[in-house]
From Swiss-Prot:
Belongs to the eIF-6 family. The keyword Repressor does not apply. It comes from the Archaea. Pfam families: eIF-6 (PF01912). This is Translation initiation factor 6. The keyword Protein biosynthesis applies. NCBIfam families: eIF-6 (TIGR00323), PRK04046.1-1 (NF003126). GO terms for molecular function: ribosome binding; translation initiation factor activity. Keywords: Initiation factor, Protein biosynthesis. Binds to the 50S ribosomal subunit and prevents its association with the 30S ribosomal subunit to form the 70S initiation complex. One of its GO terms (biological process) is cytosolic ribosome assembly.
């Protein structure tokens, strides 16, 4: 499996800065060339340098899959136009919601999405249409409503909060149609997304992620 430890801007919380699917990886401007080369090599995608809401916290603000990308309503017009032009094979939409941390509130692969319980019916419909998923439901993971922050799911597997119950795991596996395991990142963090960036081709983990955590991640993501 293509897997590599990584730090960005002096932190191991790489998932707050990076968004990826199987076609594109969106990263902050200002990364050094070696870091960008490593990201491309591991994830096997085209690299797009961008901002959202004049911020580099792309992994927090963006959610999506190979079909579509959702941006928060705080996205500035020129940022939206730039991503719309460069994410050519994906539908790109702004979700007009008071919720802006879409990466933390939507967990998705190409088949399904689990979303923040407080999204309304209109927001749920837009999310489903933009992502082109067959299934969508509102819910929690290990009593956490910020479902995108405590899990990462690809089309090959998934890793979620270590306190997720067996019943929840089975429900998640049925929803996403992949095997899903529990684990941690960055030496014990339950906020999986903050330390794990993955697609079907490769995985980046925060630099403080331990050997046992990496073994669990590799198994969970289907490698």
């Amino acid at each position: 499996m293509n897997l590599q430890r990584l730090s960005i801007f002096g932190t191991d919380n790489i998932g707050v800065y990076i968004y990826t699917n199987n076609k594109y990886t969106v990263v902050p401007r200002g990364l050094d060339s070696e870091t960008k080369e490593n990201i491309v090599q591991i994830l096997g995608t085209e690299l797009i340098e961008a901002e959202i809401s004049r911020s580099f916290l792309l992994g927090i603000f963006i959610s999506g899959n190979d079909n579509g990308i959702l941006l928060p309503k705080s996205t500035i017009d020129d940022e939206f136009r730039f991503l719309k032009e460069n994410l050519r094979d994906c539908r790109v939409e702004v979700l007009n919601s008071k919720v802006t941390a879409l990466g933390n509130t939507i967990l998705t692969n190409n088949k399904a999405a689990l979303i923040y319980p407080e999204f309304n019916d209109i927001e749920e419909k837009i999310i489903k249409e933009t992502l082109g998923v067959e299934e969508i439901r509102r819910g929690k993971i290990a009593q956490m409503i910020t479902v995108g922050s405590v899990g990462v799911v690809t089309n090959k597997g998934g890793l979620v909060h270590v306190d997720t119950s067996e019943k929840e795991l089975k429900e998640l596996e049925k929803l996403f149609s992949v095997k899903i395991d529990i684990g941690t990142v960055n030496f014990g963090s339950v906020f999986i997304r903050s330390g794990l960036v993955a697609n079907d081709k490769g995985t980046l983990v925060g630099a403080s992620t331990t050997g046992p955590e990496i073994l669990r991640i590799q198994k969970a993501l289907g490698e």
